[in-house]
Swiss-Prot record:
Residues reported to bind ATP: G111, A112, H113, G114, K115, T116, S117
Keyword Ligase applies: yes
Reaction catalysed by this enzyme: UDP-N-acetyl-alpha-D-muramate + L-alanine + ATP = UDP-N-acetyl-alpha-D-muramoyl-L-alanine + ADP + phosphate + H(+)
Pathway the protein acts in: Cell wall biogenesis; peptidoglycan biosynthesis
Protein name: UDP-N-acetylmuramate--L-alanine ligase
Length: 443
């Protein structure tokens, strides 16, 4: 790390990039970055920190910079290209993260689903008991002075997490996703097993995942779940409209009764993983209980607001398994209300590869609406549309546009769940605006 340089982030509004920028800023380094001008949910944290965010322009690149390049951008990006031509140090995001975690007790959280929620929960709990730095995929990052722990989200896309060698790893699940890169479940498993062989102390893995049960590694693997064969087990789970309580056992030793104000079975499992890490780091269980009960969640993961007589939930879910978990959480908290799903499919390749599974998960809602497919920077077109998915949905499937969100006005005293990893929030904002105007008119 160099105090004389300015760290310039190409794509600073990316969720991981913004978190990394905040960490370096906290550590006292000079930080700036560039990105698209469109507003993103990560932007607020950068603005509050006073970090300069510029529009993309090769004129941003000059002597004295160390460039950290976001993984969405190729080496042909004008800023990255100019930096290389000038001989400036250029790191990819995951490479820089691999160097940054050295010198701490590091815990990487990997998995096709549940990474961000579990990373956020672990960061919150450990921060409450010891100095902790963290990087979360919701754009949150903190570089705490003299930190004992470094908690980070380990992204499997293009095997980027292999640039890190953590002390511990939590593996929430292995599932087929990112079909633009991975060829199938065996390819995904191969990436996770390679990561497992880089872990230094121990792995905490969900016991009901058949792929995770196959892991071959040089360090112990501790399984967590609800089965008698799991090393860390949740028993007597009670789910209510205020959250969940459960007893935790480790090899039949009772560790305590825990309470979380989170919803869905997946959050009980995420909490178990956090408890397991804390146990091996000899953290007091009473402190863990307090911190777990105090956690409110991470950005864009079951984020709620009330407007008129409606409950609006914003969630990052963009894979069938995530949609199922989010709708399960909504049912737990609002068992007597109608659940309406508004889903923005994310990337053409994922929509094609998982179409039947998307339809199956979405049909768990009482009514389903879709938006057009969100195309990523890596994939701008494809041979599929939301209409193809709509044909497989039995609970509706009408396609909404930002200019006309009025079909949602047919629902009253209900829950609308907006899901997607693209810009689904613009549909959410359009609906909220429509609802607000209607409320004012009626009053």
């Amino acid at each position: 790390m160099d105090n004389a340089t300015v760290y310039h982030f190409v794509g600073i509004k990316g969720s991981g990039m913004s978190a990394l920028a905040l960490i370096l800023h906290d550590k006292g380094f000079k930080v700036q970055g560039s990105d698209i001008t469109q507003y993103t949910f990560t932007q607020r944290g950068l603005e509050q920190a006073g970090i300069d965010v510029m529009a993309f322009d090769e004129a941003n690149i000059h002597e004295g910079l160390t460039v950290i390049a976001g993984n969405s951008f190729t080496d042909d990006h004008p800023e990255i290209k100019k930096a290389r031509e000038m001989g400036l140090p250029v790191y990819r995001y995951h490479e820089f993260l691999g160097h940054l975690i050295e010198g701490y007790t590091s815990i990487g959280v990997a998995g096709a689903h549940g990474k961000t929620s579990t990373t956020g929960l672990l960061a919150h709990v450990l921060s409450g008991v010891a100095p902790t730095s963290y990087l979360i995929g919701d754009g949150s990052g903190k570089g705490t002075p003299n930190a004992r722990f470094f908690v980070y989200e380990a992204d499997e896309y293009r095997r980027h997490f292999l640039a890190t060698k953590p002390d511990y790893a939590i593996m929430t699940n292995i599932d087929f996703d990112h079909p633009d890169y991975y060829t199938g479940i065996d390819d995904v498993y191969s990436a996770f097993e390679t990561l497992a062989k880089q872990v230094k102390k121990g792995i905490f893995a969900w016991g009901d995942d058949p792929e995770l049960r196959k892991l071959k590694t040089d360090v112990p693997v501790y399984y967590y779940g609800t089965s008698d064969r799991d090393d860390f087990q949740a028993r007597n789970i009670k789910r209510s409209t205020t959250g969940s309580t459960f007893d935790v056992y480790h090899d039949d030793e009772f560790l305590g009764n825990f309470e979380i104000h989170l919803f869905g079975e997946h959050n009980v499992l995420n909490s178990l993983a956090v408890i397991a890490v804390a146990y091996f780091e000899k953290v007091n269980m009473d402190e863990i209980k307090h911190e777990l009960a105090d956690f409110k969640g991470v950005k864009r993961r079951f984020t709620e607001r009330k407007l008129a007589d409606m409950t609006i939930i914003d969630d990052y879910a963009h894979h069938p398994s995530e949609i199922k978990a989010t709708l399960d959480a909504a049912r737990q908290k609002y068992p007597d209300k109608e659940i309406i799903a508004v889903f923005q499919p994310h990337t053409f390749s994922r929509t094609i590869a998982l179409m039947d599974d998307f339809a199956k998960s979405l049909n768990l809602a009482d009514k389903v609406f879709l938006t057009n497919i969100f195309s990523s920077a890596r994939e701008t077109q494809g041979a599929v549309s939301s209409k193809d998915l709509a044909q497989k949905i039995v609970k509706g499937g009408e396609i909404l546009t930002v200019d006309n969100m009025s079909p949602l006005l047919d629902f009253h005293d209900a829950v609308v769940v907006f899901m997607g990893a693209g810009d689904v929030q613009k549909y959410e904002r359009a609906y909220e605006e429509l609802l607000s105007h209607l409320s004012l008119k009626n009053n």
